Amino acid sequence: SGMGDSGHREDYSPELYGKEILSVAEDSGFFEIGDPIICGHSMGGFMSATAGYISDKRIGGVIMVDSPIRPPTYDYSTHVRSGPIRRIKTYPDRESILERFRLTPEQDCENEYLVKYIAEWSIKEANNGYQWKFDDTIFDKLGFSHMLRNIAFELDCKLGVIYGTESNMMTDEILTFIQENVPPGTPMVPIKKAAHHVLLDQPLELAETIKGIAKKWI
């Protein structure tokens, strides 16, 4: 909720998102097929881990893609913000709003057609113009910067970590902290020539990496 064509809520929480993920899996019949594997990128990785943690049904595993689990000693003065901070406004036409589309955190992407595709599906007509679809209060309500993120270390199911080698979110400090705290044998797979938005930089390699991890778990 709060993103794309989904509705907006008065409040958001990791537990709420975890329940939403599990509800989708339940409604789609995934639990009837086997133990589902949940995969999420960035903030979605933390919500996927929450889903795996709170589920009362067996989960095949959780794969987190470029989700920075920061150590207690992390210096937030150097923190790269990834959430939208500007309030939504109305643009007069499609062209002007699409020109404003940016990845957050900002990065270059050679696959411009993918960025363009996402931008075109991120807008809606409103107030005699165009607006972004996302809930611009979501990060205020979620309290994301203060929430517990190391829940991934406490999962009963398997865990996988994928990250972009050029990601400014996955620093050496963060990668070392994750490596030292995940269960033995946890796959930590780097994707070369990929920044934080791994799916946009290396979509095919990411898909193959996810499938490779999943096949070893099934």
What are these regions (language model features)?
Residues G40, G44, S48:
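Gly/Ala-rich beta-loop-alpha elbow adjacent to hydrolase catalytic centers
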Residues A49-Y53, G60-R94:
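Flexible "cap/lid" loop of the alpha/beta hydrolase fold
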Residues S1-C39, E208:
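Active-site loop/oxyanion-hole signature of alpha/beta-hydrolase fold enzymes
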Residues S1-G4, I69, A195:
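Alpha/beta-hydrolase active-site loop signature
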Residues I88, P92-H146:
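Conserved alpha/beta-hydrolase catalytic His-Asp/Glu region
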Residues D5-Y12, T73-Y76, D172-E173:
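Conserved catalytic-core motifs of eukaryotic protein kinase domains, centered on the activation segment
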